[in-house]
Amino acid sequence: MGKREEMIKEIKELMLQPERIRNMGIAAHIDHGKTTLSDNLLAGAGMISEELAGKQLVLDFDEQEQARGITINAANVSMIHEYGDQKYLVNLIDTPGHVDFGGDVTRAMRAIDGAIIVVDAVEGVMPQTETVLRQALREYVKPVLFINKVDRLIKELKLNPQQMQERFVRVITDVNRLIRKYAPAEFKNKWLVNVNDGSVAFGSAYYNWALSVPYMKKTGVSFKDIIDLTNAGDLKTLRKKAPLHVVVLDMVVRHLPNPVEAQKYRIPHLWRGEIESEIGQSMASCNPKGKMVMVVTKIIIDKHAGEVATGRVWSGTVKTGQEVHIITAKRKARIQQVGIYMGPERINMEAVPAGNIVAVTGLRDAMAGETVAEEPIEPFEALHYTSEPVVTVAIEAKNVKDLPRLIEALRQLAKEDPTLHVKIDEETGQHLLSGMGELHLEVKLVHLKEQWGVDVDVSEPIVVYRESITKQSPIVEGKSPNKHNRFYIVVEPMPDEIYQAIREGEIPEGRPKDTKVVAKKLAELGMDYEIARGIVDIYNGNMFLDNTKGLQYLNEVMDLLVDGFHQAMDEGPLAREPVMKVIVRLVDAKIHEDNVHRGPAQIYPAIRTAIHCAMMKSNPVLYEPYQKVVINVPYEYMGSVSREMNQRRGQLIDMRQEGEVMIIISEAPVAEMFGFAGAIRGATSGRALWSTEHAGFKRVPTELAINIIRQIRQRKGLNPNPPTEKDICPQQ
């Protein structure tokens, strides 16, 4: 027991010295060896036994993760590492590499300052590597590189040292190309990874060894030694000569920033408030004596403690019993327990200061991504998720008495994972659960059963489509039911550049805090500045502008108009699917002076009908979600793979050969990708390795659209025939 007590004591001392803290994550393409690396780092730091590491997958402590062998929840672990003659506290957040769990990666990036990017030496940089690296750099997280599975180059590909070096150079060049492409301007050169300074290490997470140039210089171990020991199968000596945790954690301590350094440049980027203010300065300097601010990155349900919120403390100190504001939810709460992590276990503390990763209970209203502070402050930038929910299932409780439990469970799931959308279908009484892909939903449904004991009937997965338009509408009038209010609007398609800027967070969603700044940005992207100045709201990739001149009473109904705009965007006119890439401009209005005659029951239908009618006059179209599919397959199965993709309306983007393996990159509609896993295994006798990621939305070919609209409308209990302009526009 002595050793554990000692570690807790050391962690308590180190967490008070932010210069000695490293908050870091490990990010990679699926199966490139991320969790194995995490476990062996823990073993080296004395957190779990060395024999078990790599087989145990400590960070995969959800039973489902261990069964599937992929990491689903980003978990946090603290460990101690000695470098030089100093000790350091390393907080490690494990993130999933599977594209369906991209939301977890995005949230974890908010809490960390540096990341180890893991790349498989055989497969090289893959699409998901690019996605996670882009997310890291967007959140101002500094990367270092670990090239994994080097044992495969020696054993399977039998490469000599020269060929191995060429392979490494290629991976490093690819990673640096991505850093140059995505890093913030001031870090494009500073953050490039380099073999000589030790910001690159290579090794085998599974066999627990690693090397870096500084380590080779320090110890005299050479590449030839590694090849000889691997070929001789002497793994024990190999581990002793080049221990993975020493090499990798040395790289982390030496090259990744501590919270004091990192917050100087991260806070101005991540936080929207006034940097010169007292709280802004306190966060930028990671001041433990300032007012407390933390951001929640993950919520998990603990059988004993209830909801546990994990987050990063940016300023001040989180204390037991402290009263805090949950900013976006506009609620107050009292913190009950405060703790930090050691392995998957939480150790209770009285207080945890700025710069640390903390676990707290008592924040019932907080969701992942929420800002929690001692006093009401400007919240942090909303988190940007790189994909959006594209697959929906309808679920019903098998047993009526389980219904209240099902509702509570779904509320909880949506809170733990904001990339999951839950909606109740008013007409059928079914609960609709939308997620990033088949696997994402499958995992959540197993959670429902195992954690909550609710048995559910699940429909076949349904694809979430989007509605949009292709041309500008004439001015359309929308009348309130009492005829006392009239709104005149125009809708037009949103240019791709503007849509992209919203998706990537350059233009924030929601009501802009400073309309001038947003208008300027829109003007840079080609919108007329005078029109752009009217920006009122951005919602799910659509925009609402007020281009009227000095109208009386307009301010008093603006909130209702924005709500009505949201309703119109949530369900478009064609099939009641969400709308994307539409700009709605209010150009004139006549509003009743008496507020009794302009309540929600009058304003909502007026604006909603006007928007839908204008969309029907703008050549409405349907968009469907696409996935990028990357398949690695032996040369002889290439034909089978091409046939499989062609049957699924797939388009070939790129094809290249690496050794014996063909890498085939294509894009296909999500609707055609159900059941793909079984089919591709069958077509290639199980030899294909593949991964998918969200590739945005594309227009549905006209010949297919009518049928799809019919199916969607039928499923929703509407008249199956696609509506015409007459059906939607009120007869004048």
Swiss-Prot record:
InterPro entries: EFG_II, EFG_III/V, EFG_V-like, EFTu-like_2, G_TR_CS, P-loop_NTPase, Ribosomal_Su5_D2-typ_SF, Ribsml_uS5_D2-typ_fold_subgr. GTP binds at residues 28-35, 94-98, 148-151. The keyword Cytoplasm applies. It holds the Pfam family EFG_C. It is found in: Cytoplasm. Residues 19-230 form the tr-type G domain. The modification Diphthamide is found at H597. GO terms for cellular component: cytosol; ribonucleoprotein complex. GO terms for molecular function: GTP binding; GTPase activity; translation elongation factor activity. Gene3D superfamilies: 3.30.230.10, 3.30.70.240, Elongation Factor G (Translational Gtpase), domain 3, P-loop containing nucleotide triphosphate hydrolases, Translation factors. Keywords: Cytoplasm, Elongation factor, GTP-binding, Nucleotide-binding, Protein biosynthesis. Catalyzes the GTP-dependent ribosomal translocation step during translation elongation. During this step, the ribosome changes from the pre-translocational (PRE) to the post-translocational (POST) state as the newly formed A-site-bound peptidyl-tRNA and P-site-bound deacylated tRNA move to the P and E sites, respectively. Catalyzes the coordinated movement of the two tRNA molecules, the mRNA and conformational changes in the ribosome. Belongs to the TRAFAC class translation factor GTPase superfamily. Classic translation factor GTPase family. EF-G/EF-2 subfamily. This is Elongation factor 2. It comes from Thermococcus sibiricus (strain DSM 12597 / MM 739).
